[in-house]
Amino acid sequence: MVARRTLLAAAGAATATAAIAPFSPLSPLAATARAAGARLPVRLANNSGHDVVHAYISGTDSSGWPVFVSADGVLNRLPNPSTTVTPIADYSIALGASGSAATNVTLTDYVIGGRVWFSVGQKLQFFVNPGPVPGVVQPALVSSDPNWATDWTFCEFTYNSANLYANISYVDMVALPVSMASTGSGGDQSVSPLPTGALAAIASGLRAQHAADGAPWERLVVTDASGAVLRVMSPTHSPVGFGTYWDDYLNRVWSHFASTPLTIDGQGGIGSYTGTVSGDAIVFSGLDTNGVPFTRPSATDIFGCASGPLYNSGADARGAIAARLAAAFNRGSLLVPGGNDQPDGVPPSGYYQDPVTNHYARLVHDHADIGYAFPYDDVGPTGAAPVDGHLQDSAPTSWSITLGADGT
């Protein structure tokens, strides 16, 4: 989604460029509870059916330095270590048993590009690497990660002087359900959790899709020792490549648009551009591609929307066209009725109809009411209601996050 990408990109830029005095454990920077940031009561509830649940709140402070919030609401700036993969101190927040009273934490300062994490049964392991600004090593979706066998999930947020913006996302994975609610100047807002049974249904659907087309969809399903589903990863985190999966679809697209014009509206005042296939690229008249033509993308390019011809490079217009083309590839919406007019020509009912499509995203949308399933899932017909699963308030007075399917 646009807002989610913006907040994460801004947080990343701040981390990369912040110039901060060396950390001293005796410095008041070790833990900050500044009056400059408005206090925000946060309610962490366990409705998961599991009695041992830990929460974590991580992000950066307003200067871009990584922080963890402890149970007392204080922002703890991480020391800059001397060696790589240094374990981070335990900032876990123990929640009560499932169905018990919520645990209350009051944020005492702003947190940028943050996450609220939950883990079931055991604590998560976080690490930090040295640098001009230390880099946090978060739980990763690879089997060598020490948190691989732990059941965990997260939601994303930024809390700054402008607003609280928080969202759930399935861009990386589907796991334990999380719901949210807030109060403030924007009224009462809520975000629904993943419905009961959705995780198992998505896993089953991916296994069935593998049986149907032979692509490695089943490798996206992660189970524990008993065979229970822990999480379903998006194709960007697949342990094996999808190789030539998209080749047939791309061949048909390139053949079709060799003689049929493709018009893409960049929306937001960008304007529309029309192009046809010329050689191995779709060439849009009047569009500056910044030296990166729209050639045939790879499977990695399509699923990740962040490499090759779909990398959001150059001027705003090229980035907007790349985003809408990436969405059309993932949804298989270029060859359906109206597909030559993106994104307005195809309603959501026309998405994922081609046998070659992003079946992870298809199944997420089949079983989840809200939440994005790939990076440009915010692209849609002009005026369409967003389904990103976010809340936003310029003057929040409370924020609740619940682990479990029965939530807000």
Please provide the spans of the model-predicted regions:
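Compositionally biased regions
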Residues: 25-28, 71
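N-terminal export signals
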Residues: 6-26
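Boundary at the C-terminal end of the N-terminal hydrophobic targeting segment
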Residues: 30-35
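Extracellular low-complexity, O-glycosylation-prone Ser/Thr/Pro/Gly-rich "stalks"
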Residues: 36-408
